[in-house]
């Protein structure tokens, strides 16, 4: 464990198109090797595709997908007297955001479509409708927490 003080969280600047901090966080999550311009093109291209296919406001569909993926509880390992228990704990807002975007991107990577724009758009639309890889991951995590509810009294 580091003994220095915890690094402060720098506030994220909203993106230029939607003026939304969550969109900025998603673009940063898409970005590889510092190529933010490419990441932005992928995200906004996916938004255009969502608009064409659903006829709805892409930011609204993205927020709906985000809310559907967001985990409420997760399990954390807690060692008590020689045995390790999977203890269900509530997820903080910051961790909810990072888990949601991480799960969304790993689900996007596993999709069969050819281009990154199509994969991202497909995952956003699927998640908004309650299906897709990221939703499955969230359900698995919450099911695990539900199965271990008996150990909730070990929460710290």
Swiss-Prot record:
GO cellular component assignments: small ribosomal subunit
InterPro entries referenced in this protein's UniProt entry, alphabetically: Ribosomal_uS7 (IPR000235), Ribosomal_uS7_bac/org-type (IPR005717), Ribosomal_uS7_CS (IPR020606), Ribosomal_uS7_dom (IPR023798), Ribosomal_uS7_dom_sf (IPR036823)
A biological-process GO annotation: translation
One Pfam family hit: Ribosomal_S7
Disulphides: none
Keyword tRNA-binding: yes
Gene Ontology molecular functions: rRNA binding; structural constituent of ribosome; tRNA binding
SUPFAM superfamilies: Ribosomal protein S7
UniProt xrefs under PROSITE patterns: RIBOSOMAL_S7
Keywords from the named record: Ribonucleoprotein, Ribosomal protein, RNA-binding, rRNA-binding, tRNA-binding
Function: One of the primary rRNA binding proteins, it binds directly to 16S rRNA where it nucleates assembly of the head domain of the 30S subunit. Is located at the subunit interface close to the decoding center, probably blocks exit of the E-site tRNA.
Subunit-level organization: Part of the 30S ribosomal subunit. Contacts proteins S9 and S11.
PANTHER family hit by this protein: RIBOSOMAL PROTEIN S7
Entry's family note: Belongs to the universal ribosomal protein uS7 family.
Protein name: Small ribosomal subunit protein uS7
Record organism: Deinococcus deserti (strain DSM 17065 / CIP 109153 / LMG 22923 / VCD115)
């Amino acid at each position: 464990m580091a003994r220095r003080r915890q690094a402060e969280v720098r506030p994220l600047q909203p993106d230029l198109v939607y003026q939304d901090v969550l969109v900025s966080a998603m673009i940063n999550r898409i970005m590889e090797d510092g190529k933010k311009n490419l990441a932005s093109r992928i995200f906004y291209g996916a938004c255009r595709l969502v608009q064409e296919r659903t006829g709805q406001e892409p930011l609204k569909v993205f927020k709906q997908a985000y809310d559907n993926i967001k985990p409420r509880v997760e399990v954390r390992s807690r060692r008590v007297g020689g045995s390790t228990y999977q203890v269900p704990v509530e997820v903080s807002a910051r961790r909810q955001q990072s888990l949601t975007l991480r799960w969304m991107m790993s689900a996007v990577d596993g999709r069969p479509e050819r281009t990154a724009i199509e994969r991202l758009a497909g995952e956003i639309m699927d998640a908004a409708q309650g299906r897709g890889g990221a939703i499955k991951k969230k359900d698995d995590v919450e099911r695990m927490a539900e199965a271990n509810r008996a150990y909730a009294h070990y929460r710290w």
